[in-house]
Amino acid sequence: GLDVVKDYKQIRQQVGYMPGRFSLYQDLTVEENLDFFATVFHTTIRENYDLVKDIYQQIEPFRKRRAGALSGGMKQKLALSCALIHKPEILFLDEPTTGVDPVSRKEFWEMLRHLKDQGITILVSTPIMDEARQCDRIAFINEGEIQGIDVPERILQRFSHILCPPGLERTEVHAGNDFAIEVDQLTKCFG
């Protein structure tokens, strides 16, 4: 293992991080943000283009636009490109789809599957259970403590009393890869 104090430079090269509030420089253009993050990691966009190509091609038409003028979905793609620019082995994503429209959210999860297929380990924090279901394993955290780690279906079964408390009716709707829970009488529990 690595020591987080002594080996921080090596760890920084191996880890990509995308915070929930995208850490982009709003006054810089798309291209300038990517160049900046590449420089921080002693690389270039060209050197690691193969990893970000599929994502970058979607934002390339906006490369001269300031990040602050992008839509939520475009900011998300730019932030992901910046987190990947140095080819990390592990990618940490903190609530990556918060505030993003449903179409961009779906596209984002498709991008994550593609990155996983390329061998990148991805850790995602999300309060959205249909997103958690797309993961191979879930660490279910309740009131600040890990309650269990398992595959999504077993976590949902084991903690259904927390995820859907007694007296709260729900209907699960499955349509292909999409998943939704319709909850009745929500104000009864949360007033």
Regions of interest found by a model, annotated:
Residues 80:
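Hydrophobic anchor residue at the start of the ABC signature
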Residues 87:
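Conserved catalytic motifs of ABC-family nucleotide-binding domains
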Residues 91-94:
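Catalytic Walker B motif of ABC-type/P-loop ATPase nucleotide-binding domains
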Residues 149-150:
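ABC ATPase "signature
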